[in-house]
Design a protein with these regions (language model features):
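Extended non-globular scaffold/tether segments
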Residues: 152-163
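Secondary-structure-rich domain cores
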Residues: 161, 165-173, 177
Length: 727
């Protein structure tokens, strides 16, 4: 029969605790013990080479850090936090002033995924043995001393994790959680054999990485429904697990992902300094992504009974893990309804279209087999399942390039001879020069990698390894792919500006380029009539031929430019991709950007990710989705379409089964991604006035969730500026 301790376990207290900590954990709560032990480790390893500093330093921390256990824990692993005393706060401030959040030899920065499949296949013990065998071989053959030291450090990291797991078993035993202790002892010395052991192994590594090793870890946790399904089926067949117990373990895993977080929002609120911050809590506001569903390398949908359990147990008020569901035209209908239900209740979930993303990855240079294994890491960046490194993300700001060209044209006297085709030609040449220069600089840095091996030892280098362990860093080419990403930022602002040039300047001749340039220079002061013409011009998101045509034309320019970039000749496979991502730069860059031809005044926010500009969706949600679906995406592999929907509309649409059909139609028409905030303007404004009543109000920012009331007033106002998009 299924494990009695799991059958009898309640899960309500776990959820209650996680929600309480998300809402009420003091903002100055600090992982102070971690800071103390890291400072001790820094002194102990001062004279060692970096790989040994990393190995022995992590050993010191993991051998001594406390492992809190609560009676309701199903998975073991927490980090101690406290509000520092006056003395503790002084120590914290002095230590951070001296070494930062971590010492220089700890250099993990997250924004990546691991080879979770290899961890689950070999376990910590197998990975250690693999590295030890390679180390022994290099010693026998008198290999490079730097490589030997690198491997010695890697072996120490695996040993540190295994010993930490044993210590966690001791803590569980002392707390009377004997089944959990047995699970931990098993994975300390063997590869995981059961569903619980596999999930516990994932959590041990995630916990250490996200709270001790990496600053802003932003880790993707892999395709756990696919990776864990055999463990689940075997346990079901042997009678040691049932569906309910698996759901409890998954729910506790979700809870654990939330209790380690700090308070606040890191992109806009963090600028105001009124939240936890990365120094107090390395995990703070990092989104950890968990991937479900999608196609496998054979083109078959991986939706299974475990996918359903993972989706069913999502807690709508949690921030993490941020679920990435991969839609395909074979997606299980019942699972699809559940996914859309979670999307509609405001859960931390986003959906990608496998057919679009996989095709873009293949066009960018990823093999079809590897493209099918793609994952996203926060915020909305593509990766090849723990097998890629992203040394470059360049933000191509076409809307500011348009402003630069208007200035150039006004000064060179060519405005009278231009038409929209000639303007596009100049825009393409201008962007091409910038992109080529940035790519050449990045590629030259990557070309130097082999000469500087083995590089800096990090925890990620121990878990982004395939079957063949390579004794050098991820940032020196130990993974199979190097991805160069060229982002189109503020897409709609650029499209809407080009529409004004085409329709009002070149076609209808409502005003000249010179008139427009003077109006922009003066921030439209004295030119309100001209501004209103710009504001009322067609806008991207209205699904009309003019704006959709300019969307295609702009994206095609970007495609042509980056398709010519030569990523060959690297130590691994070079890949060039595009993305429609902005993070929260639409606010920050908007504050720095002059007035734009779409009628936007200086300082106002620019458009966000793949979304239309604020106030432009006058033709409703369906038109907005169809505009987004029609934009070409041949090499666009990621990007967030943030949609804010009225709660009443969504609830009624769910009752009538309209919402799942609407989202499916969007994807089947070529849509790439969607993420939703389900609220109303009245609710947002009420939350500003009475935050204590709305602590559960979660909103989507760019590829992560935030508690609306914990955002700064500046960030809240920027969010409210997004209009509701309803049918």
């Amino acid at each position: 029969m299924a494990n009695p301790s799991l059958k009898n376990a309640g899960i309500g207290k776990n959820i209650e605790e996680a929600l309480h900590l998300l809402r009420f954990k003091p903002a100055n709560s600090t992982t102070l013990e971690r800071v103390r032990l890291t400072a001790q480790a820094d002194r102990l390893v001062e004279a060692l080479p970096q790989p040994l500093q990393m190995g022995r330093g992590l050993q010191h921390i993991l051998d001594n850090i406390s492992i809190p256990v609560e009676p309701h824990d199903l998975l073991i692993g927490r980090i101690s936090e406290e509000v520092p005393s006056l003395e503790g706060e002084k120590f914290f401030q002095d230590t951070v002033a001296h070494m930062g959040a971590r010492p220089p030899w700890m250099d993990d920065w997250g924004h990546e995924g691991f080879r979770w499949d290899i961890l689950l296949q070999k376990g910590f013990v197998g990975l250690e043995a693999q590295a030890q065998a390679l180390l022994d071989n290099h010693r026998r053959e008198c290999g490079c001393e730097d490589t030997i030291i690198y491997l010695e450090g890697a072996v120490l990291i695996y040993q540190a994790l295994r010993n930490y797991t044993r210590r966690a078993a001791e803590a569980a035993t002392k707390a009377g959680l004997h089944d959990a202790a047995k699970c931990l002892l098993a994975i300390a010395d063997n590869p995981p054999k059961t569903f619980r052991q596999a999930l516990q192994a994932v959590w041990i590594l995630e916990l250490v990485y996200c709270t001790i090793a990496a600053l802003n870890p932003t880790l993707t946790l892999g395709r756990l429904d696919m990776l864990l399904i055999d463990f689940y089926k075997n346990d079901i067949a042997s009678g040691i697990l049932d569906e309910e117990s698996a759901g409890k373990l998954i729910t506790d895993f979700y809870c654990k992902n939330n209790i380690i977080m700090g308070r606040g929002e890191h992109q806009l609120s963090y600028v105001d300094g009124a939240d936890t911050g990365w120094e107090r809590n390395l995990c703070y506001d990092s989104p950890q992504y968990l991937t479900l569903g999608g196609l496998d390398a054979s083109g078959n949908c991986v939706d299974n009974e475990l996918t359903a359990i993972f989706v069913r147990n999502i807690v709508s008020r949690f921030k993490n893990p941020f679920i990435v569901y991969r839609y395909c035209n074979q997606s299980d209908p019942e699972i699809w309804k559940m996914v859309c239900g979670k999307l509609a209740d405001g859960s931390s979930i986003l959906i990608y279209n496998d057919h679009i993303v996989i095709n873009a990855l293949i066009n960018g240079g990823v093999s079809p087999e590897d493209a099918a294994q793609y994952e996203m890491f926060g915020c909305n960046w593509p990766s090849v399942s723990g097998n890629s490194v992203n040394p470059m993300v360049f933000h191509t700001t076409y809307v500011t390039y348009i402003l630069d060209l208007l200035k150039e044209i006004s000064e060179d006297g060519t405005a009278h001879s231009l038409d929209i085709d000639m303007f596009y030609e100049r825009l393409e040449n201008y962007a091409c020069n910038i992109i080529n220069k940035e790519f050449d600089k990045a590629k030259n840095r990557v070309l130097e990698w082999p000469a500087t091996r083995p590089g800096v030892l990090k925890v990620d280098g121990c878990f982004m390894q395939g079957q063949e362990w390579k004794p050098y860093a991820v940032g020196r080419g130990s993974v199979d792919y190097t991805i160069f990403t060229f982002v189109i930022t503020h897409l709609a602002s650029a499209i809407d500006s080009l529409v004004v040039l085409d329709k009002l300047v070149f076609t209808e001749k409502k005003f000249s380029l010179g008139d427009l340039y003077l109006a922009l220079k003066s921030n439209f002061e004295g030119h309100e009539h001209l501004r209103q013409l710009c504001v009322n011009a067609p806008k991207y998101g209205q699904d009309d031929d003019l704006t959709n045509g300019h969307a295609k034309r702009l994206v095609d320019i970007h495609h042509r430019i980056i398709a010519k970039l030569d990523a060959s000749g690297l130590c691994n496979k070079g890949v060039v991709l595009a993305s429609l991502e902005t993070d929260s730069a639409n606010v920050q860059r908007g504050e720095e950007t002059a007035a734009t031809p779409d009628g936007r005044i200086k300082g106002a926010q620019l458009s966000h990710c793949a979304s239309p500009s604020w106030g432009s969706c006058i033709n409703g949600l369906t038109a907005m989705l169809m505009s987004a679906a029609k934009a070409p995406k041949d090499i666009i592999a990621s990007g967030g379409l943030n949609v804010q929907l009225n709660k009443g509309f969504v609830q009624e649409a769910l009752k009538r089964d309209i919402f799942p059909q609407l989202v499916k139609a969007y994807f089947d028409s070529g849509g790439m991604q969607i993420q939703c905030t389900i609220t109303s303007l009245d609710e947002l404004r009420a939350a500003q006035l009475d935050p204590d009543k709305y602590r559960d109000l979660m909103v989507r920012i760019t590829g992560y969730s935030a508690s609306f009331v914990e955002m700064s007033k500046r960030a809240q106002d920027a969010f409210i500026a997004r209009e509701e998009m309803i049918l």
